[in-house]
Amino acid sequence: MNEQQRLASQQVNSSTKKEEKDYSKYFESVYQPPSLKDAKKRGKEEVKIERDFGLPEEFRNFGTGRKFYIRTYGCQMNEHDTEVMAGIFTALGYEPTFSTEEADVVLLNTCAIRENAENKVFGELGHLKALKRRNPDLLIGVCGCMSQEESVVNKIMQKNQHVDMVFGTHNIHRLPYILKDAMFSKETVVEVWSKEGDVIENLPKVRRGDIKAWVNIMYGCDKFCTYCIVPYTRGKERSRRPEDIIQEIRHLAANGYKEITLLGQNVNAYGKDFEDIEYGLGDLMDELRKVDIARIRFTTSHPRDFDDHLIEVLGKGGNLVEHIHLPVQSGSTEMLKIMARKYSREHYLELVRKIKEAIPNAVLTTDIIVGFPNETDEQFEETMSLYREVGFDTAFTFIYSPREGTPAAKMKDNVPMEVKKERLQRLNALVNKLAIEKNNRYKGQIVEVLVDGESKNNPEVLAGYTRTNKLVNFVAPKSLIGQLVKVKVTDAKTWSLNGELVEEPIEVE
């Protein structure tokens, strides 16, 4: 997910520094640092569903004459959370701006999945410090997954005392109250909930576009992979009720949206927390096949929860696309066990076989971690061989990044960083090799493309995606933006296809 280019900082006069203090007291009742033992004890406590979200009278026109700016880091869930916060700001009367210089409120919606993401946030906070000196009335906030980590929040408070508010992932709906407190408080407002929040329906949203939309179907994760901070920052698995999801998607379809992506930290665990009905992702997808919308995707999947019923439903096609993102992380059963992925290499390959049998034209992509603590050359080679055997179209690849509080962060590691980097280079070379081979097979084919807009590299060229998530660039009238068209592929590159328009537009059945 690309971030907006960092705005240049300006030299300004210093302002009075806030009194240094210990912020840990704010966490005593609402926050506990990551604990695998305690987190695994969380059971199927009843999750309340609040359907009557509304702004109290005291907040009417609260933001009139003010502007907000949100910078988002990380995954699609964060992007969607930003849409919700933008909706709340708009309901309060704020106007959006694309410049921190013009903003009255700046929020950084953060990601904690890797150290690099956290470093970017701290770097941005450093830039914003100068802006705060220049404009003391500016409110600066940090939210998202980093805010759920006590050590990170303490670091923010100690080294970035120009931050006015910190809140987490479970209480976004409390944004109006947090803003009000920050506006009138002389000290930083910290509101971080350790316990998962309820499911809040009917929150206002300002979606990024009018062609594609993200729809949360569940929150949290109960898998506790040893390297992952998400179960701690996002909480236990909580599923939205199917009728609420279907209603939202029907509403989006009625408003002209062409593609929906169902979101969840572990999306195919959907429904496992229901106690009154037996209902999973396969059941939901089967019902969504009947909705009059062109395409439905979902992300992100865990192989452990990818069941036969879901595969059977996906095989029915229709508006259910043929692209499946299925993170494997490693091709070594030994490594997978240490990662606590709860499946083996053989199980993953059998799952892939079932998917390809039910969906012969399925396109699979994945995530892979290299350099996990004590990964041997042989174990890395198993990852390379699995990649070839599956025949992925592409992959997101990473060097392992320790996350404080996770079991893996305590593991001793004897693999030098130079070796990890060399392995990543070799893996990326394989990813690139297979990507161009896969794309070359599209030459001469006619594909269905949902036109997103102008190409980022050439405004005279349109760009869109196939059902299998291939980027296609082609020359056509801008009036086709938002439409489904047929394009003949004329050239293939590693990460995209070029083509010629052959038919416009396609009616959605």
Swiss-Prot record:
Its cofactor is [4Fe-4S] cluster. Keywords: 4Fe-4S, Cytoplasm, Iron, Iron-sulfur, Metal-binding, S-adenosyl-L-methionine, Transferase, tRNA processing. Residues 440-503 form the TRAM domain. It is found in: Cytoplasm. It comes from the Bacteria. Residues 207-437 form the Radical SAM core domain. Residues 1-15 have a biased composition (Polar residues). It is an enzyme of class 2 (transferase). SUPFAM superfamilies: Radical SAM enzymes. It catalyses: N(6)-dimethylallyladenosine(37) in tRNA + (sulfur carrier)-SH + AH2 + 2 S-adenosyl-L-methionine = 2-methylsulfanyl-N(6)-dimethylallyladenosine(37) in tRNA + (sulfur carrier)-H + 5'-deoxyadenosine + L-methionine + A + S-adenosyl-L-homocysteine + 2 H(+). Binds 2 [4Fe-4S] clusters. One cluster is coordinated with 3 cysteines and an exchangeable S-adenosyl-L-methionine. Residues 16-25 have a biased composition (Basic and acidic residues). Pfam families: Radical_SAM (PF04055), TRAM (PF01938), UPF0004 (PF00919). Its main location: cytoplasm. GO terms for molecular function: 4 iron, 4 sulfur cluster binding; metal ion binding; N6-isopentenyladenosine methylthiotransferase activity. [4Fe-4S] cluster 1 binds at C75, C111, C145. Residues 1-26 are annotated as: Disordered. GO terms for cellular component: cytosol. Catalyzes the methylthiolation of N6-(dimethylallyl)adenosine (i(6)A), leading to the formation of 2-methylthio-N6-(dimethylallyl)adenosine (ms(2)i(6)A) at position 37 in tRNAs that read codons beginning with uridine. Belongs to the methylthiotransferase family. MiaB subfamily. Monomer. This is tRNA-2-methylthio-N(6)-dimethylallyladenosine synthase. It comes from Bacillus cereus (strain AH187). The gene is miaB.
